[in-house]
C-alpha cells in the first residue's frame, strides 16, 4: 500500500523516481547512487534489517518496545549495500523505511496520515489502520507464536519494528478493495500505473518476464500478488485484473501444530489451480 502512496507523491511532483537518496539523506551509504526507483524495486543493495541478528536479539528480548524508525534504518544500512546499487535484487524492508522517511520529509505529513487519507479514505477502507501501535480496533484476529521459546499471544506486540513495511492492519474485505484498485490503476495515472507494473527487475535475482518484483508487489504469471507476514500471522492476497479474480487468505499458527502445515501462501497457491488453472501458481 505504501508504495502506491510514494507513487502518488511522484505524480504530485514532490519527487522523481530518478532522484538520488542524497537529495534528502546524503549521509546514508551510497546515497548518491541509490535512487527512489531502486528503493521501490529493491535493487538498492541495502540489507534486510529483519534478518540481522543484532536486531532480532533486541526484538525477542522485548517485543513490546517502541522502535524509532531511524534506529531500524541505521541497523539496515550499517554495512552499506551488499552489491552495486541497481545491479541486482534483494528484498529488504530497509528500503521501505527509507522511503517512509523520504515521503514524510517531502510532504510534511506522517505516513499514517497519507495512508489514511489517500488510500483508506479514498477507497472506503473503513476497517484499516496505520496507527503503528498495538491498539488494533476490535474485533481483532489474535496471533500466536513460539519464536521466543514459549507459546504466547503476540497480538499486542509493538508493530513499530515494521512501520510501513508491515505495520498496517486491515480486514480481508479491505485488502480485497485495495487489490482491486491496485490492479485497475484507479489510484494512479495511467503512466505511473504502467511503470508500477513494468518488468523492471526481470533478469535480476530470480526474476523473469513472467515472474518479477514490480513496485510493491509480485507479478506472478498474471497474478498481482502480496504475501505479508508478521509474528503470529500469515497473509496472502492477489488479483488478476483482466479476469476479475481476487483472493485474500489469512492464517495463524496453532500450538503444537505441524510445522509443515500450509501457510496462507500455500493455500492461495492451491486455490489458483482451481479457480484459474491457466494461471496456476501451484508448484
Task: Put a short name on every predicted segment.
Residues 1-18, 99-104, 175, 244:
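Active-site SXXK
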Residues 2-3, 36, 69, 268:
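A general structural signal for well-ordered alpha-helical segments in protein cores
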Residues 236-257:
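Short, well-ordered beta-strand elements
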Residues 16-31:
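Short, glycine/proline-biased beta-turn/loop segments that scaffold the active-site neighborhood
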Residues 201, 210, 255-283:
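Short, gly/Ser/Thr-rich active-site loops of penicillin-recognizing serine hydrolases
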Residues 6, 178-179, 271:
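Hydrophobic "lid"/C-terminal helical patch
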Residues 32-231:
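Short, surface-exposed loop or secondary-structure junction motifs
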Residues 6-10, 25, 40-47:
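Generic hydrophobic/packing signal
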Amino acid at each position: 500500500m505504501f508504495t502506491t502512496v510514494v507513487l502518488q507523491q511522484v505524480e504530485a511532483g514532490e519527487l522523481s523516481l530518478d532522484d538520488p537518496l542524497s537529495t534528502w539523506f546524503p549521509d546514508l551509504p551510497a546515497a548518491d547512487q541509490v535512487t527512489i526507483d531502486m528503493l521501490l524495486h529493491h535493487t538498492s543493495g541495502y540489507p534486510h534489517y529483519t534478518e540481522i541478528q543484532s536486531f532480532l536479539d533486541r526484538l525477542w528480548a522485548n517485543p513490546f518496545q517502541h522502535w524509532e524508525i531511524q534506529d531500524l534504518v541505521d541497523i539496515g544500512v550499517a554495512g552499506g549495500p551488499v552489491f552495486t546499487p541497481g545491479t541486482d535484487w534483494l528484498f529488504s524492508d530497509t528500503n521501505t523505511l527509507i522511503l517512509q522517511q523520504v515521503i514524510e520529509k517531502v510532504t510534511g505529513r506522517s505516513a499514517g496520515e497519507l495512508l489514511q487519507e489517500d488510500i483508506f479514505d479514498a477507497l472506503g477502507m473503513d476497517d484499516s489502520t496505520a496507527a503503528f501501535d498495538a491498539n488494533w480496533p476490535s474485533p481483532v484476529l489474535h496471533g500466536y507464536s513460539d519464536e521466543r521459546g514459549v507459546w504466547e499471544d503476540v497480538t499486542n506486540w509493538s508493530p513499530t519494528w515494521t512501520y510501513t513495511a508491515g505495520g498496517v492492519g486491515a480486514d480481508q474485505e479491505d485488502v480485497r478493495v485495495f487489490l482491486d484498485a491496485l490492479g485497475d490503476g484507479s489510484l494512479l495515472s495511467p503512466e505511473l500505473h504502467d511503470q508500477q507494473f513494468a518488468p523492471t527487475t526481470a533478469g535480476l535475482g530470480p526474476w523473469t518476464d513472467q515472474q518479477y518484483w514490480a513496485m510493491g508487489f509480485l507479478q506472478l504469471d498474471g497474478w498481482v500478488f502480496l504475501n505479508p507476514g508478521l509474528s503470529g500471522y500469515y497473509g496472502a492476497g492477489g488479483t488478476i485484473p483482466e479476469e476479475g479474480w481476487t483472493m485474500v487468505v489469512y492464517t495463524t499458527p496453532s500450538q503444537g501444530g505441524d510445522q509443515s502445515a500450509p501457510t496462507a501462501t500455500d493455500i492461495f497457491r492451491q486455490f489458483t489451480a482451481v479457480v484459474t488453472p491457466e494461471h496456476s501458481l501451484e508448484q
